[in-house]
Amino acid sequence: MSVFVYPGSFDPVTNGHMDIIQRAAKLCDKLVVAVLVNSSKNPVFTLEERVDLLKCAVKGIDNVEIESFSGLLIDFMRKKNSKVIIKGLRAVSDFEYELQMALLNKNLDSDIETLFMMTNINYSFLSSSSVRELARHNGNIDGLVPDCIKDKIMDKFRR
């Protein structure tokens, strides 16, 4: 069984992420969307909230599972018996960072492959930080995030 892992902070999940999830899920038997605890970031949404938002967003995609992890991605990959990392790219600037990470992961485990997927051009401008900024100022996030989580995101910033 082929298991791919799509890691990220997903703070929050956007339609750009969903584009990658939907397309990557067609390439494997199981796609694990891995919500990471990143000590270098201060997420707005808690780990539990990010997992819950993703679970809502992927309802109906049968071969997608949502999990969280901390530590090295390579260790999580081994635990999941996965050899493929999925990374979404919006622009060349994303590629530079992700290439470094892919090479580092390859150095740690030569059996690991990183599959880069370009996001749909309709989402090439979209980031979690832009969604947070819009929501923080009561801006319109319609079409930027899955409908089932839009109100939860806006509610987070109304507090």
From Swiss-Prot:
InterPro entries: Cyt_trans-like (IPR004821), PPAT (IPR001980), Rossmann-like_a/b/a_fold (IPR014729). It is found in: Cytoplasm. One of its GO terms (biological process) is coenzyme A biosynthetic process. One of its GO terms (cellular component) is cytoplasm. Substrate binds at S9, K41, L73, K87. It comes from the Bacteria. The keyword ATP-binding applies. It is an enzyme of class 2 (transferase). ATP binds at S9, F10, H17, G88, L89, R90, E98, Y123, S124, F125, L126, S127, S128, S129. Its EC number is 2.7.7.3. Pathway: Cofactor biosynthesis; coenzyme A biosynthesis; CoA from (R)-pantothenate: step 4/5. Its cofactor is Mg(2+). Pfam families: CTP_transf_like. Keywords: ATP-binding, Coenzyme A biosynthesis, Cytoplasm, Magnesium, Nucleotide-binding, Nucleotidyltransferase, Transferase. GO terms for molecular function: ATP binding; pantetheine-phosphate adenylyltransferase activity. Its main location: cytoplasm. The record marks H17 as: Transition state stabilizer. It catalyses: (R)-4'-phosphopantetheine + ATP + H(+) = 3'-dephospho-CoA + diphosphate. Reversibly transfers an adenylyl group from ATP to 4'-phosphopantetheine, yielding dephospho-CoA (dPCoA) and pyrophosphate. Belongs to the bacterial CoaD family. Homohexamer. This is Phosphopantetheine adenylyltransferase. The lineage of its organism: Bacteria, Bacillati, Bacillota, Clostridia, Eubacteriales.
